[in-house]
Every structure is written in structure tokens, then in C-alpha cells.
Amino acid sequence: MYLQHFGLKHPPLGKEATELWDDGALALLQQRFQWLLDSPGVGLLTGEAGVGKTAALRVLTASLNPHRYQLIYLAETDFARLDLYRNLAIALGLEPAFRRAALWRAIKARIQELADGRNVLPVWIIDEAQNLPVEFFRDFPAFLNFAFDSRDLMTVWLLGQPGLAQTLNRAPYAAMASRIQVRLRLVPIAERERFKHLVEHGLQQAGATHTLLSDSAMELLRQASRGLPRQAGRLIQTAMRLAVPKGLNHLPDELIHEAIEVLQ
């Protein structure tokens, strides 16, 4: 109802946005993403929850040619080590074997078949990678060595919170860390002017045609969201829902305060 009330196509700063605001960080990520398409390998993207990691990768992968790349997205990572490989096998169209050796051999054969027979590169995106079992980080380099003994035939992106980078810097995971070719971190949009541009871009993308927030309301939003796009979007959407029964076509300070209380 609030979308119709404000004349919007989709929620501001929501998952439906196809063009993300960029002050340079996304352009850099796009460049590094292309690196790992041209020269397959492992990338690490970290940042606080809600900073936009998944949204950024969603936009980047949306334009991938399905005849050239096979996108495999894994968001449920709280599994045992072998279950992750079984998930990969299923995504590749395989019946997953019970034993690790047979499972690895089948995955290797399928990926080589994709490369040699169809010129297709699998792109495996593992979201919430901070929840992966630590055994996976010890195991994965051995899998990469086994599966791609002569050439790299799959790109892997690990997405996770900042603690993931700290984990991978520990000595037990040195082999895994050495396989990471790209490391990037997205940070909150904390500076006032940049945050204002972010929100205004999100509102315009959603279809807003007039100013909805005063400078003071924008500052309340910035402080409450801590510069995190997802949280800013949740607050704006909540404030809009609260505005509908009041008949308001803008979001005054008191409405932002009310939205903050609702979401606390």
C-alpha cells in the first residue's frame, strides 16, 4: 500500500534495485570481479551485515552470459564440510556421491567437461561464508589443487562479515589465504554528504519524484542506520508505512523517530 501511496515502483534501497549508488567502491569491485572471470580464482568480499555485499554481487552477476558462465549461489553455509561439496555437485547437475574422493572426482570431471566441451566457467558465490565450518577452509585448497591441477576452471567468491578475513589470516588457514587472489571490503556510508547521495539515489531509483526527507530527518536516518544501506532502507520503508494512515506524502523527523522505535 505504501508503494502506491508514494508512487513507487519498488521499496527504496530494496533488493529490486537494478542500479546501485556508487562512489567508486562498486566500480572497483566490478573491476576485480572481471579479473576473476578473465583469470579464474578465489575472491574474498567482506563487510558488515547490511553494507551491500550480496546486493553488489547480485547486480554484477545479473549481466553474466548464461552460455558462458554458470552461476552457483550458496547462502546456507551452516552445513558439514561434505554437504557443501554435495551442494556444488547438485548445482552442476550431478548425483552427489557419498564418499569425498568420488564426490571430488565427479565435480572435477563435470567442471572440465564444462570448460572443454562448452567453454563455460562456473562462478560459485558462497554467501555468509563466516558460518562455514573451519574444516572447509583447511579442506578447500586441497580440493582446488585436486580439481584444477593444471589450470583454474572455476571462480569462487567468499562473502562474509569482517571476522572472516581475520579467520583466514590465522596460521591454520594459510593455504586457503594463499589461494585468495582478490580481497575487498565494503564499508558503511558514514559521511553525511555521501549518505545523502545514497538515499536520494535509492529513492529516485524506486520512483520518488519529490523530496521526502528534510536535512534533519536525513541525519536521523544516517545515525540510526549507521550508514548501512539495508538498515536505511528498512527505516525508510517503515516510515512510509507509518505515513500512509496519517495521509503524509513526506517523512518528517517525528516519523523517522517512530520508525526507529518500531525497529528497535
Q: At which residue positions do the language-model features occur?
A:
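Short hydrophobic/aromatic beta-strand immediately N-terminal to the Walker A/P-loop
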Residues: G43-T46, Y73, I125
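Conserved AAA+ ATPase "SRH/arginine-finger" region at the nucleotide-binding site
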Residues: L74-T77, T167-A171, Q181-R194
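Mid-core helix/loop region of P-loop NTP-binding domains shared across ATPases and GTPases
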Residues: A80-D83, E95-D139, F148-D152, I189-F195, ...
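Walker A/P-loop nucleotide-binding motif
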Residues: D38-V59
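A short, basic N-terminal segment
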Residues: M1-P40, H257, E261
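Conserved NTP-binding/hydrolysis module of P-loop NTPases
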Residues: L8-G14, Y69-L71, F79-F98
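Short regulatory helix/loop adjacent to the ATP-binding pocket of P-loop NTPases
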Residues: T61-S63, L164-R179
